[in-house]
């Protein structure tokens, strides 16, 4: 158990039109003006869909949040990309620079500041 919690610090959630493939909890990318869709593997993401309703999604685009990870993710400022299954992975090229403050390898999660 962690002695500190970063959850929701600085959270900025913006509303976007959402493609049909967007589900809560998954990483999304900008697909058109004001619209998001699900990420494929290695996509640079815009944020995480927090809620989806009526063709719209609340997307966290800034602040701390816990993300599912694939593979190993280092602490510190790293480049992350979508893993294609809703979470993130270390980017091989490009990606999004984010601050990783905690990694739980057993739970396959990381606390990240976008």
Where on the chain are the PLM-derived regions?
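Surface-exposed, low-hydrophobicity beta-strand/loop segments enriched in small/polar/acidic residues
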Residues: 1-114
